């Protein structure tokens, strides 16, 4: 616990400016996005769906950027510190704490900008207020993407390689979200392990997308009820947990590897 | 620290063979050698990050402080902060003693004038001194420095090595420095010359005092040692095999005595 606190203290002493930088960047991205897609949102089905999808991708991008930018900016001395005196579990838990905080701040910013641009019912499904429901969903999406980025950082050694991989991750999230077209078979199974799918379902349910459909039409994926939203949140939480644990395990093996 | 590596293979091909050498306490040893002779591989064997056939004894893995060629530092920290955090995480010092120890190592490494400067504003030599201070303050008994003077001018390099050698003697540490810089050879207590044989395998061509090295290699200038052992296609005279054999028989004679 002492190492954990000291690591956070050390991080804050030199990296706190990252918090501000990332938050400003998030605010800028979400503002531009909301401005671009604001027409007919919460009035027409397709406009709302496009808006939610755009905001979802913004959150995924911000999450990925948080961890990848941070990890590669400190990679060299961090691996040296981990080799010498910083226990892997301390680093993984401290990093999770930092990213948790960063994602929380960014989601509040996202939810604030989102509520400024769009007029939607204030009654929430889980938190009592719909802005808060959106905020929690933004948070889970951002943190989930963040942990995915962290896992990628463990798997890929160079910043050049990760820059090649990021578009692949983003495109696969984009395709597997289920927003652009219906998925079947293997694609459907693969989609179940993506942040985009569960984030999009949660956002669509909170926005009550089904109520914007023409009479007689109903999609089975958006259910504006607390149980279904919790179901989507649980999946996002599970993805966060899996990526965090895998990152820790990968890092442990990386640090204790003996080459032949 | 006693190294006895019978063989180290990379993809089935021998990279090191018959490496028997002692690194005594209180002495600074220079490991010098030709390119591809296996200096870095030898270090990896010593710090336990690669497997090999043989033994490295009379040491504890936890006692090793490894100083990399390129300082691994948080460039946003000041020199003092970098040393402070290293000391803090080592958990060796009480809260009261911590500041005094940081101060001591800042003085030892001659960093007083730049202690409050961010590391990104320091020169290569100053960054390397911070990196060394970070390791020294952790109180480890074995210091392994990997080409820490690469890219530094001769004066800075000499100052760095001189400081490290003097700390080694004063604090009774075992220091092993890999370097291509042969001009500082007289500062060390011992020298190990690692060469690449004609079969492209690393072997020892000399291990002993720097005072006798010129007569062993039959040269007047230290630089000529490397000229003699370097391969012909690298501009040398390709006599590595001869000196490996010469040293093996020299060691055998010493053993009998």
Where in the sequence are the language-model features?
Chain B
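Conserved ABC ATPase "signature" region
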Residues: 97-114
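Topological signature of polytopic alpha-helical transporters
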Residues: 1-4, 11-12, 101, 115, ...
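Q-loop/switch helix immediately C-terminal to the Walker
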Residues: 70, 75-92, 101
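Walker B catalytic motif
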Residues: 147-149
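The feature captures the beta-strand-to-loop junction immediately N-terminal to the Walker
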Residues: 32-34
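ABC ATPase C-loop
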Residues: 135-136
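Helix-to-loop junction immediately C-terminal to a conserved catalytic motif
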Residues: 47
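Conserved ABC ATPase signature
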Residues: 118-122
């Amino acid at each position: 616990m002492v190492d954990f606190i000291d690591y956070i203290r050390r991080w804050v002493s030199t990296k706190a400016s990252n918090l501000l930088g990332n938050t400003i960047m998030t605010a800028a991205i979400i503002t531009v996005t909301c401005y671009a897609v604001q027409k007919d949102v919460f009035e027409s089905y397709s406009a709302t769906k496009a808006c939610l999808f755009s905001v979802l991708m913004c959150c995924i991008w911000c999450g990925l950027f948080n961890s990848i930018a941070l990890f590669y900016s400190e990679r060299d001395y961090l691996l040296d510190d981990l080799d010498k005196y910083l226990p892997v579990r301390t680093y993984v838990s401290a990093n999770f704490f930092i990213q948790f905080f960063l994602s929380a701040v960014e989601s509040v910013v996202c939810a604030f900008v989102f509520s400024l641009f769009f007029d939607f019912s204030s009654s929430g499904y889980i938190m009592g207020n719909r802005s808060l429901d959106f905020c929690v969903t933004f948070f889970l999406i951002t943190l989930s993407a963040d942990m995915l980025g962290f896992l990628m950082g463990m798997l890929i050694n160079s910043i050049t390689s990760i820059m090649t991989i990021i578009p692949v991750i983003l495109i696969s999230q984009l395709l597997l979200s289920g927003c652009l077209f219906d998925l079947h078979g293997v694609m459907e199974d693969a989609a179940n392990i993506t942040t985009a799918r569960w984030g999009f379902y949660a956002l669509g349910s909170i926005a009550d997308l089904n109520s914007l459909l023409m009479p007689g039409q109903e999609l089975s994926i958006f259910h504006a009820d607390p149980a279904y939203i919790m179901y989507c949140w649980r999946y996002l939480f599970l993805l966060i947990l899996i990526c965090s644990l895998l990152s820790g395990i990968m890092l442990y093996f990386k640090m204790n590897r003996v080459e032949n | 620290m006693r190294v006895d590596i019978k063989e180290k293979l990379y993809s089935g091909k021998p990279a090191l063979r018959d490496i028997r050498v002692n690194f005594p306490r209180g002495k600074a040893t220079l490991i010098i050698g030709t390119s591809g002779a296996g200096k870095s591989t030898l270090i990896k064997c010593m710090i336990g990050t690669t497997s090999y056939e043989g033994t490295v004894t009379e040491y504890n893995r936890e006692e090793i402080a490894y100083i990399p060629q390129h300082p691994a530092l948080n460039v946003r920290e000041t020199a003092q902060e970098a040393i402070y955090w290293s000391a803090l995480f080592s958990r060796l010092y009480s809260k009261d003693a911590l500041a005094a120890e940081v101060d001591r190592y800042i003085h030892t490494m001659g960093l007083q004038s730049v202690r409050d400067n961010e590391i990104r504003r320091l020169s290569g030599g100053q960054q390397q001194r911070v990196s060394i201070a970070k390791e020294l303050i952790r109180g480890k008994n074995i210091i392994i420095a990997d080409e820490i003077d690469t890219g530094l001018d001769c004066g800075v390099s000499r100052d760095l090595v001189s400081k490290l050698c003097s700390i080694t003697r004063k604090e009774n540490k075992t220091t092993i420095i890999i370097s291509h810089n042969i001009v500082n050879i007289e500062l060390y207590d011992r020298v190990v010359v690692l060469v690449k044989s004609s079969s492209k395998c690393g072997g020892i061509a000399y291990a002993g005092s720097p005072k006798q090295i010129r007569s062993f290699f039959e040269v007047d200038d230290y630089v000529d040692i490397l000229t003699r052992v370097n391969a012909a296609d690298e501009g040398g005279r390709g006599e590595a095999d001869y000196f490996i054999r010469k040293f093996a028989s020299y060691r055998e004679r010493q053993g009998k005595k």
